[in-house]
Amino acid sequence: MEKKINVFSEIGTLKTVLVHRPGDEIENLTPELLERLLFDDVPFKDVAVKEHDAFTKIMRDNGVEVLYIEKLAAETLDQHPDLREKFIDQFISEANIEDKYKEKYRDFISSLDNYRMIKKMIAGTKKLELGIDEGYKAYPFIADPLPNVLFQRDPFSSVGFGITMNRMWSVTRNRETIFPDLVFKHHNRFANQVPYYYERDWKEETIEGGDILVLNKETLIIGVTQRTTLKAIEKFSERLFNDPESSYSKVIALDLPKSRAFMHLDTVFTNIDYDKFIAHPLIFDCIDEFKIYEVSKQGTKEVKKTLIELLSDAAGREVQIIRCGGNDVVGASREQWNDGTNVVALRPGKVIAYERNWITIDLLRKAGVEVLTIASSELSRGRGGPRCMTMPLWREDLQEIKR
């Protein structure tokens, strides 16, 4: 089987990445719907698109093939027209569209070509678009928008030669996974060539990609958070370890505090070089508040080593932790809120970051890390950074370096 996914680290030279260009779903956000849709603010779409285009240009300028989930999903339906009606059925079912609107919605969505249909599924559909006027106080949508599709890190995760197709924590976001699931099962580029290590219909437990960090070819680090459970990690690990082509033997599970600051592991902790990590001070200041587990073929056990000791053991060298916001409590809080730890590596020691996090950027540069910056006045309103907005599909394998 020809390999279509190759991600054995967070820092290997990035060759192919999957993103979503912000669309009309941004303009369907209202202050009243933010909590329901798990978004933190109302961005200005035109500026968000410009910021995102600048972000993807940096990646292309650095030799990265940039793929878009909306285009891949549409291409899949173009390649396999027989899938279209079944996919529409699935979307209508998972969007929880009321029975009285289903026929009208189906007629509307079916009238669009595949690309416009996928974009409309993501954007959401207002009742007024279908000529339904129930008054100002009525709920405005037949199908809710999916603004978090912007964050392609979460619905699935590339691990080694395969992926996890995640069961997400909220009903609001779980519908996002139907697009990559369609692509990896049926797109001519990927079909029958990508092993699944987790399935979106495993409903008992949840796991999200923002909690999964691919440290190297043997070890993963996964956060146990509000959105990712230890049982889900164990279920994923069992399938991963039992794949004869998998090189993985260990998962370090960090049982983090279940708070907004620790929503996902990558909101507080990211790998940026062979021996360098960026972390919010809370992850170390609260070290006594969470447990660390090691998951292996032998089972799950609590370990008493510190996180730095575990990282050094796994990396085979002493590691350096760069504190987001430095030692300034105010700066650390502000920059963590604006995704200061959430950078994406183009290669070892070269990352893309939001330019607004200038304290952290200065510390990174002083530590020898090359930092490319992007504007983020609008992109940051969703509380996700460059790592959140990207899912690597191919990274070059890391070269061993002398210690």
Curated annotation (Swiss-Prot):
Pathway: Amino-acid degradation; L-arginine degradation via ADI pathway; carbamoyl phosphate from L-arginine: step 1/2. It is an enzyme of class 3 (hydrolase). The keyword Cytoplasm applies. It is found in: Cytoplasm. It catalyses: L-arginine + H2O = L-citrulline + NH4(+). Its EC number is 3.5.3.6. Keywords: Arginine metabolism, Cytoplasm, Hydrolase. HAMAP family: Arg_deiminase. Belongs to the arginine deiminase family. This is Arginine deiminase.
